[in-house]
Design a protein with these regions (language model features):
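Helix-to-loop junctions at the C-terminal end of transmembrane segments
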Residues: 20-33, 118
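Residue-level signature of mid-helix packing/kink "hotspots" within the transmembrane helices
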Residues: 13-22, 104-108
Length: 169
């Protein structure tokens, strides 16, 4: 792929990410931030896994549209999701700082790890794509666990029982 096409793909991902940043946040006001963040992370993981099947430039543009929407959703819902898991709002800033510090290490280490995987697999991207998709799916599972703990606490405080599928978190 030439340089101009790669820049166009970057513009497409960021451009289609705009509705991905706005619409899920609007829905999060009604259904809960974590309840919107989990499917967004799952959809992004599926998109990254499906990247392995993309073989042509037009298909890559289509893939960028889907991934841009899901990635934009994650980027905008993530900080709001952190605050929704915090019960004591005086600690929200400290918790966000701690989480963003942890995320910064992952952001710093992710590209070299992906590069090492690409080098080890002879220049193909399949291993790095699988690594990225698995990381997103693991993140979704961990968000589901955090949601489960929060819902259990909320239901215990309210004196109710059940699975808590309709709890806004």
């Amino acid at each position: 792929m030439d340089y101009t096409s790669s820049l166009n793909l970057l513009l497409v991902i960021n451009g289609v990410g705009i509705p991905g940043r706005v619409i899920p946040n609007h829905l999060a006001d009604r259904y809960g931030t974590i309840n919107m963040l989990m499917p967004a992370a799952g959809a992004a993981g599926i998109c990254v896994f499906s990247w392995m099947a993309v073989k042509s430039t037009p298909a890559l543009y289509v893939w960028c549209c889907f991934y841009g929407i899901t990635a934009g959703s994650i980027q905008s819902l993530f900080p709001a999701g952190l605050s929704s898991l915090t019960t004591d709002l005086r600690k929200a800033g400290v918790r966000m700082g701690m989480i963003f510090t942890i995320v910064s290490f992952a952001t710093l280490a992710g590209p070299p790890i992906a590069g090492a995987i690409i080098t080890a697999s002879g220049g193909t991207y399949y291993g790095a794509q699988a690594f990225a998709g698995a990381a997103l799916m693991l993140g979704m599972v961990l968000m589901a666990a955090a949601r489960g703990v929060k819902v259990k606490r909320l239901m215990r405080e309210a004196g109710t029982t059940g699975w808590g599928w309709h709890v806004k978190v």
